[in-house]
Amino acid sequence: SNIKPSISLAVFRIVQEAVNNIHKHANAKNAIVNIEFLNDNLKLYIFDDGIGFDINKVNNKIHEDGSGGFGLYSMRERVELLNGTIAINSQPGKGTRISIDIPLLQEGEGFNG
């Protein structure tokens, strides 16, 4: 299926940021990136078996002092600009799971007929 260049670029940047974060912060032995196409949606899953983190502390740090967490913030922003959803699940010692769902037909688009 043909994917709009704006979606392809956003997905590339999201995966790039996630893999960079895994490399820099996770101390992971394994990482998995999985992309599926289901019912006019792109589903992106990124998993690692690294050290994990407290998502609330990272979110609070972004808001309180403006440092840290910008990679997660930019991934969220890219997904939201495409009317998608993102779930980031992580706990210290349990690795990280990122699940993203992006509609391939953006608002106002559709099939004729």
Task: State each model region's role.
Residues 1-113:
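Coiled-coil dimerization/phosphotransfer module
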